């Protein structure tokens, strides 16, 4: 039987309607977070797409020392808690160390392990021990079949609900490529799989002191991923991505999101009807 992860009234599974995980790359302040959450909630409600709000309190792996990291865990969790209570929506955010897991789990519904940290055993253990859903991004350096080792670690440490995310693989210097086989291979582990459509177009360190990206390919890759038959799409969204503090070149402009989601719903419906 294929694994389905349940979160409140949302069911996350590779054979079910896709779930949207979206929000700005980092938490920029309470007003901005509430603005983005409200817009995304209204849009996904209108389109009948299950929605999980995402934003990060700390971008701990910025390219340069000059990169803006975010508001930090205390202020960030306070804002995410406000978003959750205001809109009654599930929340996902990143954790970067064992010490962050317990406090973060008090607020959010899903703990996300960043791609660069996907093999860090102590971090996986700490996340699993919270009892929360754990979503792991496959490292850009890791083969999809090697995610079975990540799965085994989490299961040994007690994790019951696991999600895996594809976010591209290293393709030479400052470039990533999306191998759609990865989605099918990770699905064979009986884990719901999510495709990160925005980080997959990232050009790591491509601007010297920061990462670049090719936003124009986000929709194309999202359509391809949905056509495989997956559990969710992850997209970072901003009302003014070119002036966002991080990952602007990859993020989708809020005004363009609706048209993309309408197309993805059609692709998702056809794919799962055929299967």
Swiss-Prot record:
<keyword id="KW-0963">Cytoplasm</keyword>
<dbReference type="InterPro" id="IPR006218">
    <property type="entry name" value="DAHP1/KDSA"/>
</dbReference>
<dbReference type="GO" id="GO:0008676">
    <property type="term" value="F:3-deoxy-8-phosphooctulonate synthase activity"/>
</dbReference>
<comment type="pathway">
    <text>Bacterial outer membrane biogenesis; lipopolysaccharide biosynthesis.</text>
</comment>
<dbReference type="GO" id="GO:0019294">
    <property type="term" value="P:keto-3-deoxy-D-manno-octulosonic acid biosynthetic process"/>
</dbReference>
<dbReference type="InterPro" id="IPR013785">
    <property type="entry name" value="Aldolase_TIM"/>
</dbReference>
<keyword id="KW-0448">Lipopolysaccharide biosynthesis</keyword>
<keyword id="KW-0808">Transferase</keyword>
<dbReference type="Pfam" id="PF00793">
    <property type="entry name" value="DAHP_synth_1"/>
</dbReference>
<comment type="similarity">
    <text>Belongs to the KdsA family.</text>
</comment>
<dbReference type="GO" id="GO:0005737">
    <property type="term" value="C:cytoplasm"/>
</dbReference>
<comment type="pathway">
    <text>Carbohydrate biosynthesis; 3-deoxy-D-manno-octulosonate biosynthesis; 3-deoxy-D-manno-octulosonate from D-ribulose 5-phosphate: step 2/3.</text>
</comment>
<dbReference type="InterPro" id="IPR006269">
    <property type="entry name" value="KDO8P_synthase"/>
</dbReference>
<protein>
    <recommendedName>
        <fullName>2-dehydro-3-deoxyphosphooctonate aldolase</fullName>
        <ecNumber>2.5.1.55</ecNumber>
    </recommendedName>
</protein>
